[in-house]
Regions:
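Canonical alpha-helical transmembrane segment with a positive-inside/aromatic-interface signature
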Residues: 125-171, 175-177, 183-188
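Non-catalytic terminal accessory segments
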Residues: 1-152, 404
C-alpha cells in the first residue's frame, strides 16, 4: 500500500460531538446503579411473599449487602489509580453477576409471578419460592454460559459487502476486522495467540483493528498484545485508536502497534492498489481523543482524506459507529467500527442504542455510505457475553463491474 501521511491535530472545539443522552445518564449511574442492582434482587428473592427461616433471610440479606458494598470498592481499587488486577476481576465479576440477577429478578419477578397467579398455582408463598429458584437457576446457567462465550475464540462472521464505486480489480478483496480485544486484568495471552491464528487462516488482503486494544497501559498489557505481531495480510495491517486507549496512555498503544508492524492510521490514509484499481484506506482517532488533552490527537476526517482522489472509493476505520454521520457527509463508501460489543450482556443493548446509531452488523446511512459494526472480539469488564457473541469478521468487498466470483 502507498502511505500518504496527513496526520493533523484535531479540529476546533466546535467540532466536538455533543454530549449524548447516555453520557448524561451515566453521570448519575455510579450512585444509583449499585443500590438498584443489589437491592432489587434481594427484595424479590428474599422479601416478597416468602417466609424463609430467619437464618436464611439474614444470611441472604447480608450476602447482598456485601455485594453492594464490595462491588464499588473493588471497582475503585481495580480501575482507579492503584490498578489492582485482582480487585478489578472481583469488581467486574460482581458487576456482571448483579446485572444478570437484577435483569432476571425483574423479568421473572413480574412475568413468572403473574403467570403463576393466573394459572392459580399454589399459594402466594409457593409462587414466590418458585420465582426465587427460577431466578437463581436462570442466573447460574447464564453466568456459566456467558463466561464460556466470553473466553472462547470468536466465531468467524462472513459477509459480502457490495460497493458501487469499487473497481473490478478489487472485487473479492478480503478484509478481516478485529476490534475491542480489551486485553485486561484476566491474562488472555493464549487467547490472543489463538485469535491471531484464526485470523491467519482467512488469507486476508487487509486486516483492521478498530481500537480498544486493552484496558491498561501498553507496558502493562504488552504480553497479551504481542501476538498481534504475528497477524499476516497480503496488503497490510491497519489500526485506529478507541476510547479505552485514551484512558491508558494512548500514545503508548500507537507506538506498540507500530512496533508490531501495524499501520496506525491517525487521521491519515493509505492507498491499496490491486488489478489496476485503487481503494483509499483511511482512519481517524477516536472521537474521545478530542477531549483527552493529548497533543495532536483528535478525530479529523478532513485530514485523513487530504490528498485522496475524491473519485476513489474509501474504506474508513473509526472506532465508534456514531462517527458515521461525519462519514456520510464526506461521502465515505464503507465505515468499519466496533465499540458497542453488541450490548455484551443482554439487555444492555437498549442503553447502547441511546448512544450509537447501530448496534451490530451492516447498515445504510446515506445513499453511498455503509457502516459495519462489529460486536467485538473480546469483552470489556465483566467476563460474560450473553446473547451478544463475539466475532472475527471477514468482509469480502464486491464490485458491480464484473460477476461475483465464487
Amino acid at each position: 500500500m502507498t502511505d500518504t501521511d496527513n496526520t493533523r491535530p484535531a479540529e476546533g472545539a466546535a467540532q466536538a460531538p455533543r454530549q449524548s443522552r447516555l453520557h448524561r445518564l451515566m453521570g448519575y449511574l455510579p450512585l444509583i446503579a449499585p443500590v438498584l442492582l443489589w437491592a432489587v434482587p434481594c427484595w424479590v428473592l428474599l422479601h416478597t411473599g416468602q417466609h424463609w427461616p430467619l437464618p436464611v433471610t439474614l444470611a441472604g440479606t447480608a450476602l447482598f449487602a456485601l455485594g453492594l458494598v464490595g462491588m464499588p470498592l473493588a471497582m475503585v481499587r481495580g480501575h482507579g489509580r492503584r490498578q489492582q488486577d485482582r480487585a478489578a476481576i472481583v469488581g467486574d465479576t460482581l458487576l456482571g453477576t448483579s446485572w444478570i440477577l437484577f435483569t432476571w429478578a425483574v423479568l421473572l419477578g413480574v412475568l413468572l409471578r403473574l403467570a403463576l397467579t393466573v394459572a392459580d398455582v399454589g399459594e402466594s408463598q409457593d409462587r414466590a419460592r418458585i420465582v426465587t429458584w427460577a431466578v437463581l437457576g436462570v442466573t447460574a446457567i447464564l453466568l456459566a454460559w456467558g463466561y464460556a462465550e466470553a473466553r472462547r475464540v470468536p466465531r468467524v462472521r462472513r459477509l459480502d459487502v457490495h460497493l458501487p464505486r469499487l473497481g473490478a480489480g478489487l472485487d473479492g478483496l478480503r478484509v478481516v476486522l478485529i476490534t475491542d480485544t480489551h486485553y485486561g486484568p484476566l491474562d488472555r495471552a493464549r487467547w490472543s495467540a489463538r485469535v491471531c491464528e484464526t485470523v491467519n487462516t482467512l488469507n486476508a488482503d487487509l486486516v483492521c483493528h478498530t481500537g480498544d486494544i486493552a484496558d491498561g497501559t501498553a507496558e502493562r498489557r504488552r504480553a497479551q498484545a504481542v501476538p498481534l505481531g504475528t497477524v499476516r495480510a497480503a496488503h497490510g495491517r491497519v489500526y485506529v485508536t478507541g476510547n479505552h486507549e485514551y484512558y491508558s496512555e494512548a500514545q503508548g498503544w500507537v507506538d506498540l502497534m507500530d512496533e508490531l508492524g501495524w499501520e496506525p492510521l491517525r487521521n491519515r490514509h493509505l492507498l491499496l492498489e490491486r488489478g489496476g484499481d485503487t481503494l483509499v484506506i483511511a482512519g481517524v482517532d477516536d472521537v474521545t481523543a478530542e477531549s483527552s488533552g493529548l497533543a495532536g490527537h483528535g478525530a479529523h476526517l478532513t485530514g485523513a482524506l487530504d490528498g485522496a482522489d475524491p473519485d476513489l472509493p474509501v474504506l474508513l476505520l473509526a472506532h465508534q459507529p456514531t462517527f458515521v454521520d461525519r462519514a456520510a457527509a464526506a461521502g465515505i463508501d464503507l465505515q468499519l467500527s466496533g465499540h458497542t460489543h453488541g450490548g455484551q450482556i443482554w439487555p444492555f443493548h437498549h442503553l447502547v442504542r441511546l448512544d450509537q446509531p447501530a448496534l451490530a452488523g451492516l447498515s445504510h446511512h446515506a445513499p453511498r455510505t455503509l457502516l459495519y459494526t462489529s460486536r467485538g472480539t473480546g469483552f470489556w469488564g465483566p467476563p460474560f457475553r450473553i446473547f451478544a457473541p463475539s466475532e472475527i469478521t471477514l468482509l469480502t468487498l464486491r464490485s458491480p463491474h464484473l460477476p461475483t466470483s465464487p
